[in-house]
Amino acid sequence: FHILEVRAKETLTRAGEPGRWIDYSIDSLRADFLEVFAAIEKNSKGRYRIIYNLARQQPADYYVDFVVESADNRSVAMPLFFKDVMRDLIANARKYTAPGGTINVGVYETEAELRFVVQDTGRGIPPDEIQTVVHYGRRGSNVQQVRTMGGGYGLTKAFLVTKRFGGRFWIKSEPGIGTRITIIVPRPTGPRVG
């Protein structure tokens, strides 16, 4: 239930200040996402594991590489909504990648911008659908039969949040190879918020 408490607190905070950026220590951000990965694995009811050491990967395991860095090597500032975006895109990567696949996640903050990349070895998105897959409720035609608990809004939310903060959003994907989503958001000027 700890993860639900954290999400509820984040939601209430965002309601009052939707444009606010907040500083997260790199260690706490990593810990938060290790909890997210643990919850995803637990929800599988033993169908797969999420592992972080490639040498331990078995055929039913997802290998996850999750790296967070910043110019100061201590903290990363991001919009309050951005952790949700990260969670959604990571969940999509897992959902559309078969067990045995790889999910790479990178976060890097410079003085000028926040960069986020998630890349998987999943199904990919048909090339003629990349422009429209960010529309509300849309999924690629090659995943219509995949049973999901979501409504197809993760990419939409990621795209809209990125645009809301003046950022840039790219999808590079190839069916049968995987997908790479890159988001770059300019940092606001002024002091960092803790």
Residue ranges and their predicted role:
Residues 177-181:
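Glycine-rich GHKL/ HATPase_c ATP-binding element in histidine kinases
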Residues 166-172:
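Glycine-rich ATP-binding loops of the HATPase_c
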Residues 93-94:
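Short helix-loop "hinge" at the ATP-lid/N-box region of the Bergerat-fold HATPase_c
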Residues 120:
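Acidic ATP/Mg2+-coordinating residue in the GHKL
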